[in-house]
Amino acid sequence: MELLTFGWAALLAVFTFSLAMVVWGRNGDGSIGF
């Protein structure tokens, strides 16, 4: 795997995870402390 491809994949994974944290945090279920 090329390093650039791996870098973009990692960046996308982090972005997706962060977006999920924000969405779940705004649902107000209180299970996540954001």
UniProtKB/Swiss-Prot annotation:
Family, per entry: Belongs to the PetN family.
Function: Component of the cytochrome b6-f complex, which mediates electron transfer between photosystem II (PSII) and photosystem I (PSI), cyclic electron flow around PSI, and state transitions.
GO CC annotation: cytochrome b6f complex; plasma membrane-derived thylakoid membrane
Domain of life (superkingdom): Bacteria
NCBIfam families in alphabetical order: PRK02529.1, PRK14747.1
TM stretches of this protein: 3-23
Primary subcellular site in the record, as a coarse category: membrane
GO biological process entries: cytochrome complex assembly; photosynthesis
Membrane topology: Single-pass membrane protein
Protein name: Cytochrome b6-f complex subunit 8
InterPro entries assigned: Cytochr_b6-f_cplx_su8_sf, Cytochrome_b6-f_cplx_su8
Subunit structure: The 4 large subunits of the cytochrome b6-f complex are cytochrome b6, subunit IV (17 kDa polypeptide, PetD), cytochrome f and the Rieske protein, while the 4 small subunits are PetG, PetL, PetM and PetN. The complex functions as a dimer.
Lineage, top ranks: Bacteria, Bacillati, Cyanobacteriota, Cyanophyceae, Synechococcales
Gene: petN
Gene Ontology molecular-function annotations: electron transporter, transferring electrons within cytochrome b6/f complex of photosystem II activity
